[in-house]
Amino acid sequence: MQFWKVHGARNDFVLVDETEEEVVPESDKPDFARWACDRRSGVGADGVVFIRSDPPSVEMRIFNRDGSEAEFCGNAARCVVKYVTEVRGENVKILRTLSGAHRVEVQGGWIAVEVPEAEIKKVVELGYEVDAGVPHFVRLTERDPIHDFGGLTDEAKTIFSEYEPKGGVNVTYAAPSVDELRVRTFERGVGWTPACGSGVVAASLVYSEIFGPFEEVSVRTAGGCLRVSLSDGPLLIGRAEIVYKGELRGDWRENTDHQRRRHSLSRSPSGRPRLQECR
Amino acid sequence: MQFWKVHGARNDFVLVDETEEEVVPESDKPDFARWACDRRSGVGADGVVFIRSDPPSVEMRIFNRDGSEAEFCGNAARCVVKYVTEVRGENVKILRTLSGAHRVEVQGGWIAVEVPEAEIKKVVELGYEVDAGVPHFVRLTERDPIHDFGGLTDEAKTIFSEYEPKGGVNVTYAAPSVDELRVRTFERGVGWTPACGSGVVAASLVYSEIFGPFEEVSVRTAGGCLRVSLSDGPLLIGRAEIVYKGELRGDWRENTDHQRRRHSLSRSPSGRPRLQECR
């Protein structure tokens, strides 16, 4: 079984091309995602994307590390467009996902992806409630959220827990500096990540509202540089990298470590993990 | 450039076969290790092993994530023997490393590797100072070090710091249960790891000294089951897995993220990280 390892702003994915044929049966997709994302005994990634290319559009489905299916991811979208363009040599304009159709465009080494409209819903004491397709609490800070985010963790957890009754929130810190915005997000269910696409868009909107208006905002994240075009879309613009092509050896379902960990995560009657015999 | 992703008890490695020719120039090997081990923009691994097979022996060199070269690693050794046996179809009896020659043997699905002799140097109040090729402080515990190790971290750090003036020590916790020993190690410079080969050997020696003597000890780690034959070698016996074959796309040196992170880790005169322009 063939796959590709790709990343956008250090948000990394296993990409499986199912254009010619289904490679992982539908019912196996969640378990494959759990296995493939395991960084030590699988391939190692934040998620798995399955694609079907049908120029001028391409379909992308994305599964998280826990096997759940997500609607959309800006970083994954760029990787898919880069793959279809450079590996399949095809030209695509539309990316189809569970969250609908998104305009995409290759701009030299950069890839632009139309992302859900972002809107400031409420201004509160500590920051801004923003809907960017997913809920964000944008907090302006003078600290450097890229290198100095450790000290922000407790506050981020406090803000997160206040919104937990309403399904929780992604807490995005933004530090305006001379010619760019430095952003890092404490993501719901994940924690700090190198670069959260919707967080970058939410922070750019608030930045433009207070200091702008700006047509385009240049954002630095721990995963690299992104740009947000607010006047057109909005568009999330960034790079993507195709790191390598892989060929699995043997059937991933037979992978002993995956079986052992699935087996050991099942609970014995006493509630303790049931561990296989050390044979 | 071709590589293989392998793991032994969830201690994972990028394997580069240089039998036919040098694949990564000597001077690039440390930098390649730093790039390849990066779990998001590289391949992702604990280390990189370079091998040259010359039956009945095989040479293994191993580089850590930080680019430093290590002398030996039991988990990596099993992966190398599995690769030479199953992928190259060759029969090897001796593994050559910086720490010398090690007897190796394939036993069905298990692989036995001769590891450095282990010796209890001193018995102190909290545990046992053991030389297993590398220094270990073995501490017996009633807690389950596989699932319940969080609570042991502070103590492990305290013990580690007491030995820091003497170069530090790996702190290995061992919990004897009915028919097996449960072991986890707080490794020098790394922290908790799924399975440390020398830690498993050190703990087995102490276990045999107190409750034995035993010819062979069965050990459960967070990375799976290992066995230690004390009467013969000693031998560290365990499984290994070849997960996939990979083909890098383009030159890893040109990998923009690796360049960006190397560039951004260089310091400007003020001491702050020097960050590339967000172009």
Curated annotation (Swiss-Prot), chains A, B:
Region annotation Disordered: where it falls in the sequence: 255-279
Presence of the UniProt keyword Secreted in the record: no
Pathway in which this enzyme or protein is active: Amino-acid biosynthesis; L-lysine biosynthesis via DAP pathway; DL-2,6-diaminopimelate from LL-2,6-diaminopimelate: step 1/1
Cell compartments where the protein resides: Cytoplasm
Transmembrane segments: none
GO BP annotations, alphabetical order: lysine biosynthetic process via diaminopimelate
Classification via InterPro entries: DAP_epimerase_AS (IPR018510), DAP_epimerase_DapF (IPR001653)
Location, primary (coarse class): cytoplasm
Recorded superkingdom: Archaea
Record site: Could be important to modulate the pK values of the two catalytic cysteine residues: H136, E187
List of catalytic residues: C73 (proton donor), C196 (proton acceptor)
A GO cellular component annotation in the UniProt record: cytosol
This protein's record includes keyword Amino-acid biosynthesis: yes
Amino-acid positions noted as binding substrate in the UniProt annotation, renumbered to this chain: N11, N64, G74, N75, N170, E187, R188, G197, S198
Enzyme class: isomerase
Record-level Gene Ontology MF annotations: diaminopimelate epimerase activity
Its EC number(s): 5.1.1.7
Function: Catalyzes the stereoinversion of LL-2,6-diaminopimelate (L,L-DAP) to meso-diaminopimelate (meso-DAP), a precursor of L-lysine.
Assembly behavior: Homodimer.
Name of the protein: Diaminopimelate epimerase
Organism: Methanopyrus kandleri (strain AV19 / DSM 6324 / JCM 9639 / NBRC 100938)
